[in-house]
Amino acid sequence: MIDILRDSKTIAVVGFSSRESRAGYYVPAYLQQQGYQIIPVNPYLEGEPLGETPYPDLQSVPVPVDLALIFQRSENVPPFVDDAIEIGANAIWMQLGIRRDAAAAKAKAAGLQVVMDRCALVEHRRLRAQQVL
């Protein structure tokens, strides 16, 4: 987890939400404030959330993605993991409450680092407080 947060620069947020009260918005907003490049991924987004161009899917993202941060129901995760593998992402992070063991195993077998059922905001703050990041 430390390596993922330390080494990632570009984070594609699958399931980015335009609602500020949802974790799919405020977690990436926090990460952007910490210096990460955030790429919203959601086919239904309009405008430029957080000042960034949104993309309908991971394959449409025109830059290399270090981390695919997933805000989707657990049962919906497998195709996003497949997409992350296909585009050459370095890691998959399934947000708090999201776990899909078979998809995680597939990602690991493809060489990706995987985090499941953890909040990226909480973990980033915790690691910063420990002066690890």
Report each predicted region and the residues it spans.
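Conserved beta-strand elements of the Class I
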Residues: I11-V14
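NAD(P)-binding Rossmann-fold cofactor-contacting core
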Residues: S17-R22, A29-P49
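A short helix->loop->beta-strand "cap" motif at the edges of active sites that frequently abuts
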Residues: Q34-Y36, I87-A91, A110-L112
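Active-site regions of enzymes building and remodeling cell-envelope glycoconjugates
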Residues: G51-L58
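Mid-chain, well-packed structural core segment of small domains
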Residues: L58-I98
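Rossmann-fold NAD(P)-binding glycine/threonine-rich loop
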Residues: L96-H124, A129-Q130
